[in-house]
Amino acid sequence: DASNAQKQHDVNFLL
């Protein structure tokens, strides 16, 4: 799911 992948990317960016 591309939407979920983008969400994970955002989380990693915040970390």
From Swiss-Prot:
Instruction: Tell me which Gene Ontology terms the entry assigns under biological process.
Output: humoral immune response
Protein name (Swiss-Prot/TrEMBL)? Lectin 80 kDa subunit
Q: Which residues form a coiled coil?
A: none
Query: Top-down, what is the taxonomic lineage of the species of origin?
Result: Eukaryota, Metazoa, Ecdysozoa, Arthropoda, Crustacea
Q: Where does this one sit in the cell?
A: Secreted, Extracellular space
Any one GO MF term held by the record is: monosaccharide binding
State the family it belongs to: Belongs to the tyrosinase family. Hemocyanin subfamily.
Q: Does the keyword Methyltransferase belong to this entry? A: no
The UniProt keyword set, sorted, is: Hemagglutinin, Lectin, Secreted
The annotation note on the cofactor reads: Binds Ca(2+). Mn(2+) or Mg(2+) can also be used to a lesser extent.
Quick check: keyword Secreted in the entry?
yes
Tissue distribution is:
Hemolymph.
Q: Which GO terms describe its cellular component?
A: extracellular region
Its biological purpose is as follows: Sialic acid-specific lectin. Has hemagglutinating activity towards erythrocytes from several species, with high activity towards, rabbit, mouse and guinea pig erythrocytes, and low activity towards human erythrocytes. Hemagglutinating activity is blocked by treatment of erythrocytes with V.cholerae sialidase.
What are the names of the required cofactors?
Ca(2+); Mn(2+); Mg(2+)
Assembly information from the UniProt record? Heterotetramer of two 80 kDa subunits and two 52 kDa subunits.
